[in-house]
Design a protein with these regions (language model features):
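Noncatalytic linker/hinge segments flanking ATPase motor cores
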Residues: 9-23, 38, 147, 163-165, ...
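Active-site segments that bind and position negatively charged phosphate/pyrophosphate groups
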Residues: 11-130
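C-terminal charged capping/lid subdomain of soluble metabolic enzymes
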Residues: 113-191
């Protein structure tokens, strides 16, 4: 939703080359709302082997809704960060969704999102056990140089960072990565 919420659907060309629209943004928003409402309930149910309505809602959000939203309105910084993280060997063992989760936090920092929104997403990730720090992604001590490697790859001309509604530089992204990592440590209270 964050990546799509930043795109002006009147001017945006989606992943498949079509104009973005209100439907894509609405589906992305529904995806986000479903994850927030049912994500923790679904995780807990699955840990006990239970198939509950919350699990079914999350499956629908993760497949159908996110797929249609993606086709209709594309991707932005969160997925570009994922792509940049693939440049660090330490992150190779992490799942796509884990890297995108951290990328979402980076995108929120990059956008200077309200504290309440950052806290909501950080809290959600922490409750689900999703990474909120680079250490959790396998990078023991994040350096500025590593952040720049990720940032430069994320800002490649053919990546999705170009879908942000403002010009983004590798330096801005590196600072957002460092800031997101610091916030993650703060909210985990491990620094």
């Amino acid at each position: 939703f964050f990546k799509n919420n930043n795109l002006d659907y009147a001017d945006f060309v989606g992943f498949l080359g079509d104009k973005g629209g209100m439907a894509g943004l609405a589906l992305a928003k529904l995806c986000y709302e479903t994850l927030m409402a049912d994500g923790v309930k679904a995780k807990v149910a699955l840990e006990k082997g239970a198939l509950t309505p919350a699990v079914e809602h999350i499956i629908e959000a993760n497949t159908l809704l996110s797929g249609i939203g993606f086709e209709s309105s594309g991707l932005a910084a969160a997925h570009a960060i994922h792509n940049g993280l693939t440049m660090l060997p330490e992150c190779h063992g992490m799942y796509h969704g884990e890297k995108v989760a951290f990328g979402t936090i980076v995108q929120l920092v990059l956008e200077d999102a309200p504290t309440e929104k950052l806290e909501e997403v950080l809290g959600f990730c922490i409750e689900l056990g999703l990474p909120v720090t680079m250490k959790e992604l396998g990078v023991a001590e994040l350096t500025r140089e590593q952040a720049m490697i990720v940032a430069e790859a994320a800002c490649a001309p053919d990546d999705t960072m170009c879908n942000m509604p403002f010009e983004v530089t590798p330096e801005m992204v590196a600072n957002a990565i460092l800031g997101a990592d610091a916030l993650g440590h703060y909210y985990l209270m491990d620094e």
